[in-house]
Amino acid sequence: MEVTRKADMKTVDGPAGYFTGKATITGQFQRPDPSRVSGAIVHFEPGARTNWHTHPLGQTLIVTEGIGWTQVEGGPVHEFHAGDILWCPAGHKHWHGATAHAGMTHIAIQESLNGSPVTWMEKVTDEEYLRGPAGKDQ
């Protein structure tokens, strides 16, 4: 059994090439073969979000704090809250992040295929992002 203590976890800024706004990544892990699991705790300041991206075997997000938005390409923006669990199926182009006015933290868990857990794509435009969920006042 391997135990990683919170005090030993490193926090890094989310790379500007993959995130818009201020995001931090804590406790990033990649398990050794034969496991394909990787993950991290990701915190988004208000207005921060990922680029569009896909996961070859899907992704689970466990929301631990705040309020966020997510969208699968071509679909509506969905709002989620602390305590919610999100599943994005394999290959679905999507983004996720904080709302425009509230921060959000989630634990992201995904598996790698051929050594890669994610394919990063273009940035989510401000216009796409600020649409927010249907029926919500921005």
What residue spans do the PLM features occupy?
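A short, N-terminal "cap"/entry segment at the start of jelly-roll beta-barrel domains
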Residues: 1-37, 117-138
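Glycine- and acidic-residue-biased ligand/ion/polar-headgroup-sensing regions
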Residues: 46, 55-74
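A short hydrophobic beta-strand segment most commonly corresponding to one strand
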Residues: 60, 87, 101-121
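Short acidic-glycine-tyrosine-enriched beta hairpin
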Residues: 74-90
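Asparagine-centered strand-capping/turn motif at beta-strand->loop junctions
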Residues: 97-99
